[in-house]
Regions:
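Flexible C-terminal active-site loop/helix
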Residues: 1-14, 18-32, 38-45, 65-70, ...
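Hydrophobic faces of well-ordered beta-strands that scaffold small-molecule active sites
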Residues: 14-16, 35, 40-44, 77-86, ...
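A short, acidic/glycine-rich surface segment
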Residues: 23, 91-92, 199
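Short, glycine/acidic-enriched capping/hinge loops at junctions between secondary-structure elements
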Residues: 26-27, 44-46, 54-55, 93-95
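A short, polar/charged loop-to-alpha-helix boundary motif
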Residues: 51-60
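Active-site beta->alpha loop and helix N-cap motifs at the rims of alpha/beta catalytic domains
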Residues: 52, 72-130, 134-138, 144-150
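Short, flexible, glycine/charge-rich loop motifs used to bind or transfer phosphoryl groups or to couple energy/partner
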Residues: 70-72, 96, 155, 203
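Catalytic core of soluble alpha/beta enzymes
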Residues: 113-254, 280-285, 289-291
């Protein structure tokens, strides 16, 4: 990839900070650089704790989105998405599902330092009660559990009819062991944090660590690499789920392109995890891509110039992001 000159990136970069409606992975603000390029907007939003090597892959994705022609068709008018329930009380979980229009599929956050197993179980039970018997439930532990702890938790919640558990443990070796243990009850495992680079999938396949892989466009370096990763996963007999990295509508749009392609190839493609704009208290486009009832209407993003001004990050954060951009650009 031959990236656009750094000066051009800096000239069209807007550093923004968006408040979250609910704390997510310990965050209360989501920071990003939005590039207002002549060919349309793109987003660069690696989490602040990521090192420059990892963040540079996200930058490659942002550059690809607006400075290189896509090999994929434009996304369809709508795509299927799951709802997402963060680590909230059962009552709040029920309220969120109602506000989301009762999506057919819901991902429930479990594990982590802010929620006990008892609280996790109660949350999942509330989601099952709200969805009824035909709704589909996914769990996402973000690698928070130890091996035996994960097995105990999954067996405890088995009665809630769980489709699969996303990254229940951190290491691939433990994922492989847990997958063998879970085979008897028919609950699959999905690799998310384990897939951060294109080559990571090779280790997942070699160790038999997952049934499903979670694909996020920015961390993999763009749509081309994400598409190649999907083809490799399918060749190995794995299913894929397209998911967000808690992006604005700009990032969600580019990921929706990939989901739309999957749905065009397979009408039974798994619902995407792209309905996360609802966790942002504001957005930087004229028509935010907010899901309802398990559907996400997809419109090409048009930046809201007033929002870019209103949501502009503080001077010190802007300087931090621009310095990060220069460092990461040098690694491309």
């Amino acid at each position: 990839m031959v990236p656009s000159p750094l000066s051009e990136l800096l000239e069209c970069a807007h550093v923004v900070s968006l408040a979250l409606t609910t704390p997510f992975r310990g965050l209360t603000q989501r920071e990003a650089i939005i590039f207002d390029s002549p060919r349309g907007p793109s987003e660069w939003s690696p989490f602040v704790e990521y090192d420059d090597a990892e963040a540079s892959l996200w930058l490659a994705s942002a550059i690809e989105d607006c400075w290189h022609d896509s090999t994929l068709p434009e996304p369809p008018a709508s795509i299927r998405v799951n709802g997402t329930i963060p680590a909230v009380s059962p009552q709040e979980a029920t309220t969120l599902i109602t506000k989301a229009g009762f999506p057919h599929t819901v991902k429930v956050k479990v594990g982590g330092p802010t929620s006990s197993l008892t609280e996790d179980h109660a949350r999942v039970q509330a989601v099952r009660a709200a969805l009824g018997p035909t709704g589909r439930i996914r769990l996402d532990a973000n690698g928070a559990w130890a091996l035996d702890e994960a097995e105990h938790a999954i067996r405890l919640m088995e009665h809630c009819d769980i489709d699969y558990v996303e990254q229940p443990v951190e290491s691939l070796a433990d994922m492989a062991v847990l997958r063998t243990r879970m085979a008897e009850i028919g609950i699959g495992l999905a690799a998310d944090e384990s897939i951060r680079r294109w080559a990571d999938l090779d280790a997942v396949i070699a160790q038999g660590a997952a049934d499903i892989v979670v694909i996020k466009v920015q961390p993999l370096g763009g749509l081309r690499r994400a598409h190649d990763t999907i083809k490799k996963a399918h060749a190995a007999g794995l299913q894929v789920v397209i998911s967000s990295a808690l992006e604005t509508s700009v990032g969600i749009y580019h990921a929706a392109t990939l989901q739309g392609f999957l749905e065009s190839q397979n009408p039974h493609a798994l619902d995407a995890g792209l309905g996360t704009v609802s966790f942002l208290g504001d957005d930087i486009v004229e028509s935010p891509l907010r899901a309802h009832g398990g559907k996400l209407s997809v419109t090409k993003p048009r930046l809201d110039q007033g929002a870019l001004t209103r949501l502009r990050a503080s001077k010190d954060r802007e300087q931090w992001w621009r310095a990060r951009l220069e460092r990461c650009f040098a690694l491309l």
